[in-house]
Amino acid sequence: MITLEVDLGERSYPIHIGSGLLDNAELLRPHVRGQHAVIVTNETVGPLYAARVEQALAALGKTVRTVTLPDGEAFKHWETLNRIFDALLQAGADRKTTLVALGGGVVGDMTGFAAACYMRGVPFIQMPTTLLAQVDSSVGGKTGINHPLGKNMIGAFHQPNAVIADIDTLRTLPPRELAAGMAEVIKHGAIADADYFAWIERNIQALNACDPELMAVAVQRSCEIKAGVVAQDEREGGLRAILNFGHTFGHAIEAGMGYGAWLHGEAVGCGMVMAADLSHRLGFIDIETLARVRTLTQAAMLPVVAPELGADRYIELMKVDKKAEAGSIKFILLKKLGEAFITSVPDADLRATLAHAVLKPPTEAPVA
């Protein structure tokens, strides 16, 4: 087992990465201080892993309740969130009750938001079971739900007590979900570590096959990068924005196609190619670097061609992005491989990237 730390002073917390961690009651013991625990999972993950976590908590003498949500980005909204609140209230949960997010990014985001809101804040633990959640969304305290007009527009910063990433859970991921997680792995190399990016290039076929040793390396390095950024800028006042590389375009794809048509990681993968194209058009990266981003994204079984929503529709959706200021869209671009920055861009260059990126006619599922 590898243990990292997100250094936030009194609110610092560990990230445990390894095999067989779902059953490890001793990892949970320091972080479940009250008598009651509520596991939040979904219809896919629950039957696979919930009983193991229930048993670990019961071994600590805790009273355990499990809430099972529908699976998918399409359910990341108020109605589903209220299921968590209903369960907490019906169980008589108090301020010492610990929530446990057992699932992917949607479960983690909603459980964290419920923890931030219930009684104005209760503790929670992230137990991510997808690659995307293990390398990205479980770390950093961003929580929230979607709104029909924008992704993750309603939420809060609420740090977990711990992140427990059992890489054994990656073995049960469908290939499409594994690929979606690889988008965030590639992102971390692109924005912060050119050597890591090159390592991913060399090992992409084995990573696609979910080689356990290489996957453990990827989860560790991605968590190191994200934890380092979050420690410097917890609430995204500056540096943390670079973690949104590919997300401005990606969120527009998700909203424009309808939440769930594209997985979040698929939209981010395509968005990274679009952001790299824009970086090249503005003279920051050369054509070879653009080609490397596109080639690696495609090799990870991710889409590199965007749906045709129309340039005006893309721009309308991107103006709702949280990074936008006074209607000005902000993009995370590459200065070079391994270094990113935030900027606004000329409208003509943005429209050129959008025109170059799309495939006609629109597709219901992403095209690699």
From Swiss-Prot:
Its EC number is 4.2.3.4. It is an enzyme of class 4 (lyase). SUPFAM superfamilies: Dehydroquinate synthase-like. Zn(2+) binds at residues 184, 247, 264. It comes from the Bacteria. Its cofactor is Co(2+); Zn(2+); NAD(+). Keywords: Amino-acid biosynthesis, Aromatic amino acid biosynthesis, Cobalt, Cytoplasm, Lyase, Metal-binding, NAD, Nucleotide-binding, Zinc. GO terms for cellular component: cytoplasm. InterPro entries: Dehydroquinate_synthase (IPR050071), DHQ_synth_AroB (IPR016037), DHQ_synth_fam (IPR030963), DHQS/DOIS_N (IPR030960), DHQS_C (IPR056179). Pathway: Metabolic intermediate biosynthesis; chorismate biosynthesis; chorismate from D-erythrose 4-phosphate and phosphoenolpyruvate: step 2/7. NAD(+) binds at residues 71-76, 105-109, 129-130, 142, 151, 169-172. GO terms for molecular function: 3-dehydroquinate synthase activity; metal ion binding; nucleotide binding. One of its GO terms (biological process) is aromatic amino acid family biosynthetic process. It catalyses: 7-phospho-2-dehydro-3-deoxy-D-arabino-heptonate = 3-dehydroquinate + phosphate. Binds 1 divalent metal cation per subunit. Can use either Co(2+) or Zn(2+). It is found in: Cytoplasm. Catalyzes the conversion of 3-deoxy-D-arabino-heptulosonate 7-phosphate (DAHP) to dehydroquinate (DHQ). Belongs to the sugar phosphate cyclases superfamily. Dehydroquinate synthase family. This is 3-dehydroquinate synthase. It comes from Cupriavidus taiwanensis (strain DSM 17343 / BCRC 17206 / CCUG 44338 / CIP 107171 / LMG 19424 / R1). The gene is aroB.
